A protein has these predicted regions:
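ATP/nucleoside-binding phosphotransfer catalytic cores, i.e., glycine-rich phosphate-binding loops
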Residues: 28-29, 34, 59, 69-166
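Glycine-rich, aromatic-lined ligand/substrate-binding cores of catalytic
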Residues: 11, 38, 59
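Glycine-rich phosphate/pyrophosphate-binding beta-alpha loops
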Residues: 41-56, 131
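Interdomain hinge/lid region at the active-site interface
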Residues: 62-65
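Short, small-residue-biased leader/transition segments that mark boundaries at the very start
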Residues: 1-5
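Active-site-proximal catalytic alpha-helix in oxidoreductases
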Residues: 14-17, 38-45
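Glycine-rich, charged/polar anion/phosphate-binding loops
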Residues: 9-13, 21-29, 50-55, 96-100, ...
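A transmembrane-helix-recognition feature enriched in membrane-embedded lipid enzymes
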Residues: 6-19, 80-85
Length: 166
């Protein structure tokens, strides 16, 4: 197992040993949701944390964020959800799978902000493996804000796919 995967697995174990879940207020493209949840993943790519397929259909170049909120569940249910989530089996063909619907909320958005809606202090946000306590987190799409370098074979597949869509 890689180091990133080990750190992600350790983080999950640490979370399971403590208080599970938070009440969080989300504003997703203006829609306000207050949810008792375990976690939220805001994705513009398919995987993170050594292979967790959080956003199995998320694309970095489509101008959208795929937002997955995992509702608060018992420890007993977490193992089942973890395998769905890790393998990307919670989302197929643009929607949550039947197995995931009771436990996940999905939205497609241009902007997402969230903040704790309980009295347990700041939210712990993770980006690229770095964790930090945050009073509020905001993520939004910034078209053409970055450059991505691809190896030649990947670039050829990318341009061929774009040409086929037109």
């Amino acid at each position: 197992l890689g180091d990133v995967y080990k750190r992600q697995a350790l983080s999950i174990v640490q979370q399971l040993c403590g208080h599970i879940g938070r009440r969080v207020e989300y504003v997703i493209d203006g829609e306000v949701l207050t949810v008792d949840c375990l976690m939220c993943a805001v994705c513009n790519g398919r995987a993170y944390g050594g292979g967790f397929m959080a956003g199995p259909e998320a694309q970095p170049d489509d101008g959208w964020l795929d937002v997955f909120i995992v509702r608060k569940v018992s420890r007993r249910v977490i193992a089942k959800l973890l395998m769905l989530y890790k393998n990307g089996q919670h989302f197929q063909n643009g929607q949550l799978t039947e197995a995931a619907k009771p436990y996940f909320i999905y939205r497609r958005a241009k902007s997402v902000s969230l903040r704790a809606a309980d009295d347990r202090g700041p939210i712990i946000a993770t980006a690229d493996g770095e964790c930090a306590p945050c009073e509020q987190v905001r993520v939004e799409v910034q078209p053409l804000a970055g450059r991505v370098l691809l190896p030649q074979p990947a670039y050829q597949r990318f341009t061929a796919k774009k040409a086929a869509v037109k």
